[in-house]
């Protein structure tokens, strides 16, 4: 009986070796290979901006153009970033930048109120000065202070940094502020006499007049509202944007600013 059991065991072993690959049993004893995940694909950076001539705007060919836009292209290309630029009304651009990771917004002024909401890359633009512009024909308007402007109607972009500033100084929407999401409508309102002032930079209002074939002499500065020497226009990122991507952009921007003077 003992010989039968031994023979049967040898027979089963031989049968298993004929059916299974010879190294199957040994495979379980070998260390399993370590699978190294492939690197993540390049991050596509979403870039948003607004219509703010001559810094960022949509040209006649439907392309995003402007002095700031050109610099953004140069910086992001130098950083090796994959990106796409889209233009939105300012309030929508801000909402996208504040709610969607891997998003960058420009040209945005770095203020204490905005500081904690973004990761910053500065400066993008030279300092700018904003003025209250009026029609040259409106000699009846006299301003000695910003408070004097509260007696009039001022047109400006909703949600812009100067909107935030005027609200902090006691101005009110619907009372002495005429707010719009469309920057191109502001100059039209001023020329039509629907508002008393337009608040913007000299570069912006002169470019707006040029676009509609109106002479610069039609408007003059009634009051310098704010010198933004201490609040430079920047590029800003959603806080959850890839940190290495942000650092790449910062390095590229610093190098660009070192090599060139302004945008």
Predicted regions and their residues:
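Acidic, polar ligand-binding/catalytic clefts
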Residues: 73, 86-148, 222-229
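Extended ligand-binding regions for polar small-molecule ligands
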Residues: 66-78, 138, 151-152, 160, ...
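Ligand-binding cleft/hinge of the Venus flytrap
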Residues: 70-81, 146-150, 159-181, 209-216, ...
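Short coil/turn segments
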Residues: 51-53, 60-65, 110, 135-140, ...
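Short helices/loops that flank or line small-molecule/ion binding pockets
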Residues: 91-103, 184-204, 211
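Bacterial N-terminal signal peptides
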Residues: 9-21
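Extracytoplasmic small-molecule ligand-binding "clamshell" domains
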Residues: 29-117, 179-180
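Periplasmic-binding protein-like
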Residues: 49-51, 127-130, 214-250
């Amino acid at each position: 009986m003992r010989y039968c059991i031994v023979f049967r065991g040898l027979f089963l072993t031989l049968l298993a070796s004929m059916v299974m690959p010879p190294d199957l049993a040994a495979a379980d004893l070998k260390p399993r290979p370590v699978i190294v995940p492939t690197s993540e694909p390049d991050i596509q950076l979403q870039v948003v901006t607004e219509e703010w001539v001559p810094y960022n705007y949509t040209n006649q060919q439907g392309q995003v153009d402007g002095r700031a836009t050109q610099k953004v292209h140069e910086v992001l290309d130098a950083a090796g970033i994959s990106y796409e630029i889209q233009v939105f009304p300012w309030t929508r651009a801000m909402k996208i930048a504040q709610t969607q990771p891997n998003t960058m917004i420009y040209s945005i002024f770095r203020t204490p109120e905005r500081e904690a909401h973004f990761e910053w890359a500065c400066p993008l633009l030279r300092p700018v000065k904003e003025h209250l512009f009026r029609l040259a024909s409106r000699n009846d308007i006299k301003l000695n202070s910003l408070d004097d402007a509260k007696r009039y109607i001022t047109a400006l972009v909703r949600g812009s940094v100067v909107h935030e500033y005027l609200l902090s100084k006691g101005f009110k929407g619907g009372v002495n502020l005429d707010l719009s999401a469309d920057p191109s409508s502001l100059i039209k309102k001023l020329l039509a006499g629907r508002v008393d002032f337009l608040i913007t930079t000299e570069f912006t209002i002169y470019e707006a007049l040029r676009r509609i074939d109106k002479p610069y002499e039609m408007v003059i500065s009634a009051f310098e509202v704010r010198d933004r020497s201490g609040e430079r226009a920047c590029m800003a990122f959603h806080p959850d944007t890839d940190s290495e991507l942000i650092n790449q952009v910062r390095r590229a921007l610093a190098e660009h600013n070192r090599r060139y003077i302004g945008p």
